[in-house]
Amino acid sequence: MDEPEDRGTAFIFADGAGAFLLGPANEPGVGPTVWGADGSEFNTIVVAPNWLEIRDTCAADGEFVWPTLHMEGQKVFKWAVSSMVGVCYQALEAAGVTPDDIQLFVPHQANNRITDALVRGLKFPESVIVARDIVMTGNTSAASIPLALDGLVNDGLAKSGDLALMVGFGAGLAYAAQVVRIP
């Protein structure tokens, strides 16, 4: 899906898959989800041409053009750093906790500059462990949060009972944040 010549996407994105398995627990461990979308910026991350355009082009002249990802990285960066801190605070409030109660911060692994800006904006104590596996895995889109948390668990940095704030965002521009307790 990446255009190999597009320096804004080709070297950032990686392949990955992740999932969270939930089961019964004696105490609630998954906080409320804060989610939404900012449709005013829908065109900052797009796949083009879209499938309707491909269908119409193929019907008209028989040519098939494979769609590729296009991203306005600076716009996404500015939107993420100006919007996601507020979304994180909403998730903390919905869970009834503060930044001081959090042990782990697991943001979408878009890039380290966004993560740095979010950490500064949330004013976490120094003890909060911040997932930064983008340097090893790249931006694996929706898989980045499960993979980053798995890395923290495997490295012994995430402990049972820790509270983790997770926040993700992507095309649309859609977003979600939630506080979870590590089992």
Residue ranges and their predicted role:
Residues 81, 85, 92, 103-183:
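Claisen-condensing/thiolase-fold acyl-transfer catalytic domains that form or cleave C-C bonds
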Residues 60-67, 90-94, 122-126:
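Short amphipathic alpha-helical segments, especially helix-boundary/capping motifs
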